[in-house]
Amino acid sequence: MKKFLLLIAFSLFFFGQLKAQKTDTLSITLDNVKYPYPVKYFPINTEGQDIKMAYMDVAPTSNANGKTAILFHGKNFGGYYWTNVIKALTNIGYRVIVPDQIGFGKSSKAFIHYSFHQMATWNKRLLDTLGVQKTVVLGHSMGGMLATRFALMYPEKTEKLLLENPIGLEDYKTFIPYITTAQQYQTELKTTAESVRKYYQGSYFTYWKPEYEFLVNIAGGVTNSSDYPRWAKVAALTYTMIYEQPVLYEFQNLKVPTVLFIGKEDKTIVGKGLLTPDQQALHGQYKLLGKQTAAKIIGAKIIEFDACGHIPHIEIPTEFLVALTGSL
């Protein structure tokens, strides 16, 4: 009996350890996350701080056409989730530049004032340094807000604006209760791999698949780092940026060819947890927001995907990549 109880105790401990190790501890600059292509760093000095922006610069693999595309990631992501898009674009002759924005991915987690204007400026400087005169700009989620700001500020630099399920199609501050950055920081500190998975399942995807776990492993892995409070503070600062700096009132000012790619089942709302279920049902309805946004942008085209959520390039990669390359 004693041996049996010891065996049970050992089994519980063993499986508990397996569960605890399921999400590895990651550094907040993702030093132990392998990116699909070599990572370089662009030095920046701002607010008296020397910081660095990580980026991948991937050459075309065949039939170089002399054109460039820059990819802007979403708030909960980094350059690591663009692999299939990079391959598709380099295969048709594009040079592809993939930055991790300051505060995200492998870039510095700086305590600064975050703004889409400043981010756009840094990306323009990066492109200038790399000798890029004009580029296709593809932005996903938060990257869609940044891509919009970039196109508004630098239309001469923007060959085409491509928006994949961008956030900011609603003015969140008109219906999401205001909370301070300090309050959002406390919320971010409570993040776990399980809470990340639950949010992704409920907002981002129509049906959860094991291959999506890599997104949770990264977003959840950093929560185990001793430096996670710094990550959480930056996440709170960029939440405030999104909340306070809408771009939707300027869609009509865009002067570049624009295409929206919309997964119609997306229900993303920034600050969703601050709403009741009834309130949530009134917002984040991309099957409506996509068309409404396209109507605001002169000459915009919209490509919608049924049975697809927030990240078409991951959820329906073949269909998305065909639509993407066909829009260039």
Residue ranges and their predicted role:
Residues T191-E250:
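Conserved alpha/beta-hydrolase catalytic His-Asp/Glu region
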Residues N45-Q49, M56-A59, N91, Q101-L138, ...:
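Active-site loop/oxyanion-hole signature of alpha/beta-hydrolase fold enzymes
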Residues K287-L328:
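Catalytic active-site module of serine/aspartate enzymes centered on a nucleophile-bearing elbow/loop
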Residues G139, G143, A147:
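Gly/Ala-rich beta-loop-alpha elbow adjacent to hydrolase catalytic centers
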Residues T148-L152, L161-T191:
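Flexible "cap/lid" loop of the alpha/beta hydrolase fold
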Residues F42, N224-G290, A295:
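Conserved serine/cysteine hydrolase catalytic core
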Residues E47, I51-K106:
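Conserved HGGG/HGGXW glycine-rich cap/lid loop of the alpha/beta-hydrolase fold
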Residues I28-P60:
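N-terminal cap/lid segment of alpha/beta-hydrolase-fold proteins
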